[in-house]
Amino acid sequence: MSIKLFSLAKELNVGVGSLAGFLRKKGFDVEDNNPNVRIENEEFDLLLTEFGKSLPKGEAERIRKKFVKQKQGTPASAPSAKEETAGMAAKEAQVIATEVPQDMRPRFTIKGKVETEKPAEPVPSPKDKEPDTVREDKPARETAPVKEETKVVPVKEDKPKEEKPKQEEPKREEPKPEEPVQAAPVAKPVEKPVDKPQQPVMTQKPQEAETPPPAQEMEKKEDTEEVFRLKTNTQEPQVKVVGKIDLSSINSSTRPKKKTKEDRQREQNDADGKKKRKRINKAAVDVKKEAAKVSGEQGKRNAGGGNHPSGNKNNNRPAQQQSNASGGRKNNKRQSLPPKVEISDEDVQRQVKETLARLTTKKTSTTLGRGAKYRKDKRDAASRAAQDAMELNSEEQHTLKLTEFVTVSDLSNMMDVPVNEVIATCMSIGMMVGINQRLDAETINIVAEEFGFKTEFVSADLVEAIAPEEDNEEDLVARPPIVTVMGHVDHGKTSLLDRIRNTNVIEGEAGGITQHIGAYGLKLPSGRRITFLDTPGHEAFTAMRARGAKITDIAIIIVAADDDVMPQTVEAINHASAAGVPMVFAINKIDKPAANPERIKEQLANMNYLVEDWGGKYQSQEISAKKGINITELLEKVLLEADILELKANPNRRAIGSIIESSLDKGRGYVSTVMVQNGTLNMGDVVLAGTCHGRIKAMFNERNQRVKQAGPSEPVLILGLNGAPAAGDTFNVLETEQEAREIANRREQLQREQGLRTHKILTLEDISRRRAIGNFQELNLIVKGDVDGSVEALSDSLIRLSTEEIQVNVIHKAVGQISESDVVLAAASSAIIIGFQVRPSVAARKQAETDGVEIRTYSIIYDTIEDIKSAMEGMLSPEIREEVTGSLEVLQTFKISKVGTIAGCMVKEGKVKRTSKVRLIRDGIVIHTGELGSLKRFKDDAKEVVAGLECGLNLAHSNDIQDGDIIEAFDEIEIKKTL
């Protein structure tokens, strides 16, 4: 038994890492970060025994049975079915093998006699040659051989011994399809040797009677084919094949009696010519006797129209072919059956059934019958093809054709599974993902398999199109480490970088929070270089942090000493550990009076991250980024981690790296921030990144200074791409621009196909669900931003705001200024345009005013999310709540013409307003709900009546008021719904 560790972890409700760690303690070699690793019986028993203790009673046994059933149930059943079919085939083969030799022996011995006796007889040799010449001419002359095939139908009944072996050997029927036609030519050679003496021929024919059978046998084969086709419809039981073998054995036993009848026929031929003709037809074995053929032709001439009725009665082929003699022969054969009855009653019944079966097939084997059979076969083939197509479609429905790095939302749409379930599955295997985060192939396989889908990646050829270059050991040189600063928002990530770089980046960020992923190169006083990546800490920038962890070598996790380990900090730690990146913990803000670094270390220890001060393996440093305390010590620890990793790269090769950010600059075009991971990037190189390509026109470092080349671990800003590649894409340097263009075009085509696959069409189920909800709303948004990472993060956050009643759709997202095309799209789809740190052009603003399209611009992601939330709350239908204001008792009723029933009431509690809605209650049952028609105190109209006072009133649209009824007054209050 071999099962995936991930499947067992899910059943035991234990993390994969815990199971792997336990197995390693027991001496098994198990990978820690691979949930797909398979375990055997011994490991399975150990895990179930150890972790099954905490399960409810009987749960461990249920899990054991489940996996044993999964692994043993299906494989065992399939082979057994094959073995049974093989066994049945073997049994049938054995039954046939016992009976076939008995049928084959007389046939082969007789054919051998024919060949030995032919050279001895000079007379039959010319006879044999003449039919041969006629046979060669005949097929060329005759255009309708079918008529002559059927003439020999009676012969099949007289010689059933040869039918059955032929059916057992269907391969012999195919090589000689034209020989049945040769049976008819026998009629012409008969005319030439008519004058020859018949008696010597008759004496020799019993032995030579087997020379013509090859032609007759082939005719019989076609007839037997018809019988065989009839039985092909019921071939499944395979019992009828055995029955045919038995019949052949019976017929072989009747064969010698036919020879004795020939002797009798010779005696009767001299006495009576009529009987002679009939019995010659009866002994169809001797059809090729020249004398018998002459008599057969005479019978045809004499029997002319008299035998037509018999042919019609039989409804067989001879009726169509003017073969009157054949009809007569069949009648004679039926009369000749009684002497055969002497053998056995059972044999007779079998033979009669076979004959009737042949006759019924003959009725349907007319020209019309053949057409019907052809149409039926065609219908059967069409139905089988349709069934196969349905099975293929069902398989295709459970096969996902996708490109690698599909987003979570696209994957959920293709599987028709809620996004939350996909995210929960990813979290169960230790991956923190967002809605718009792209997954790699291995993760997609795991998630799809969990929901019962198979995956087929259609972009594998494009990945292989760029062949990786191998580096020689002697070419590798040390490279600077890439360090990512990660942590919760406002915990001091950017302040630390400011202190290290002696700049002030925070002032340039809107709202004082980092909204872009920044890359900075730094040269230390010791001469060593470090590349820093600053990631956003806000919860919306999950994908950015994941990208930062993917391309980094070392992660600095910053935690504020006066705060706790916050959710984004935990998420950053998970990203770094999932990527296998070593971490250094920096406890910031120790200069504050409320700082408590020991509490932070305790919280980290509770998460299984022990720092070195507490006996663990993770380095930590207490710092103050604002005052510059212990910054040098922190950098030394980072360099120590880098020395342990032995980071190397080959600068003498074409560059490869990752896209950190991309944006659209009005003066410079599309600008991309890239991190070179290996090789050297030069001016003029042809770069391919995702679906974008181009030749580098200019390169700038993080201080906006021009550079001509960038080595490993250097971040640079490049100009020249024809679009804004997605953040996180890998870029490659290719030899020619044509090659880059071809690959980019194919990738773009695949991306469009992927978009069509993930486009979800509104189904009846969705419509019924919306009808059930009632007031279903859709909010369409177009998101434009300054950089790709911010657009992705904002779109992710906005889509997450969707509820059951309001669905948020980001119909378009892009980098750059808000243009006229965005306004046109928004007008067509009733969408709102969200601009994040971008402004609309003059033409776009005028177009928006004309079309009535709303454009909202923001600089801080918090404000954007809050505004969209409030807009969605305004779209929600308000919640209506009833508030009872008072109750009245009807003391007496008065009926007034043209007015209706007036009720004199006493207000028991609360007060009754003229505008209040009322409910009439009788014996605790609501009789009527409506509004007041009038409310009076004495003769004056009253706006309200308080408790303890009497009043008169009548109900609008109702006069059914009785003494003793209770009237309840209430107001409906609309309460604004919140998300």
Swiss-Prot record:
Cystine crosslinks: none
Region (G1): 487-494
Residue segments, region Disordered: 68-392
Domain annotation tr-type G: ranges: 478-646
Database matches in SUPFAM superfamilies: Initiation factor IF2/eIF5b, domain 3, P-loop containing nucleoside triphosphate hydrolases, Translation proteins
InterPro entries cross-referenced by the UniProt entry: EF-G-like_DII (IPR053905), EFTu-like_2 (IPR004161), IF2_II (IPR044145), IF2_N (IPR006847), P-loop_NTPase (IPR027417), Small_GTP-bd (IPR005225), T_Tr_GTP-bd_dom (IPR000795), TF_IF2_bacterial-like (IPR000178)
Residues that coordinate or bind GTP: 487-494, 534-538, 588-591
Keyword Nucleotide-binding: yes
Bias kind Polar residues: ranges: 309-326
PROSITE patterns documented for this protein: G_TR_2 (PS51722), IF2 (PS01176)
UniProt similarity note: Belongs to the TRAFAC class translation factor GTPase superfamily. Classic translation factor GTPase family. IF-2 subfamily.
UniProt-listed HAMAP family: IF_2_B
Protein name: Translation initiation factor IF-2
Organism name: Porphyromonas gingivalis (strain ATCC 33277 / DSM 20709 / CIP 103683 / JCM 12257 / NCTC 11834 / 2561)
Phylogenetic classification of the source organism: Bacteria, Pseudomonadati, Bacteroidota, Bacteroidia, Bacteroidales
